[in-house]
């Protein structure tokens, strides 16, 4: 019934897994390289772990809240697309490890297709957990409680280690504006403002439209050069144009990358080979 909200805690699957399989599909088809595939996996993890909201908003909650926040300004948010892409990768590796390389997330999708779509019915989180449990002969309820319904940081070292990879982290300085925006209404419309961030200190509000930065077009602004600097924002708010000074913060961004463990065991190499098969 699309005349009303259809709240679901599973958009991290429906949308996020699509992101993951977009990357998997282009890699398996030979369009992208192994290095690009591994970089995408690491970047998804970095995209989540460098986001303040991940401490407070679970993938299930971000899925449900899309009905409140997609086109309505919200104070705080995180992408269930990226959350789901990251979790899909971790589930794929976990399933491969728990089945000694004989099954993967592909098999979960086949089961969802055959047991649900072809029979004209949807699926719940419990259905999905049941399918994974049946395939792996393991109980994945704890995984879901911690990482889907909860906000715990996944054990990346252990899970990427299933495929004989080490997750490397390297700090990088990046500008911290303290807001998220969308290009619309003739500028960048602020969709969320992080508590205690640079945007909040500048008295910016959700719904404000930034039209100029330092007198120039917002679409041509060199955002990457603003760390630690004071800039002047021209903002449209409630039909009025105002100017606000803003001191742009600087924060440490942890860049992630995957490197092969030269001491990988035969089991790890088997999982790796299956994961990277084209």
Feature annotation, model-predicted:
Residues 1-23, 28-29:
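Catalytic cores of extracellular degradative/oxidative enzymes
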Residues 22-23, 31-278:
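C-terminal recognition in membrane/secretory proteostasis and scaffolding
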């Amino acid at each position: 019934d699309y005349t009303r909200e259809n709240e679901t805690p599973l958009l991290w699957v429906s949308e996020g897994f699509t992101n993951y399989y977009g990357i998997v599909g282009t890699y398996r088809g030979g369009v992208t390289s192994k290095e690009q595939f591994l970089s995408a996996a690491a970047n998804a993890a970095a995209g989540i772990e460098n986001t303040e909201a991940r401490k407070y908003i679970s993938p299930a909650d971000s899925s449900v809240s899309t009905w409140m926040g997609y086109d309505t300004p919200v104070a705080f948010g995180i992408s269930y697309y990226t959350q789901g892409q990251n979790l899909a990768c971790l589930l794929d590796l976990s399933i491969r490890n728990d089945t000694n390389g004989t099954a993967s997330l592909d098999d979960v999708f086949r089961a969802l297709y055959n047991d649900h779509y072809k029979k004209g019915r949807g699926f719940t989180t419990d259905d999905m957990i049941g399918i994974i449990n049946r395939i792996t002969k393991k109980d994945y309820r704890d995984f879901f409680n911690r990482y889907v319904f909860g906000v715990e940081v996944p054990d990346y070292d252990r899970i990427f280690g299933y495929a004989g990879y080490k997750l490397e982290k390297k700090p990088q300085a990046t500008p911290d504006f303290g807001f998220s925006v969308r290009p619309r209404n003739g500028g960048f419309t602020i969709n969320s403002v992080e508590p205690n961030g640079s945007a909040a200190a500048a008295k910016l509000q959700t719904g404000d439209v930034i039209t100029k930065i330092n007198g120039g077009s917002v679409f041509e602004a060199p955002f990457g050069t603003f760390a630690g600097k004071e800039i002047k924002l021209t903002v449209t708010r409630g039909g009025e144009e105002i100017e606000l000074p803003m001191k742009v913060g600087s924060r440490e961004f942890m860049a992630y990358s995957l490197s092969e463990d030269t001491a990988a065991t035969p089991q790890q190499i088997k999982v790796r080979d299956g994961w990277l098969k084209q």
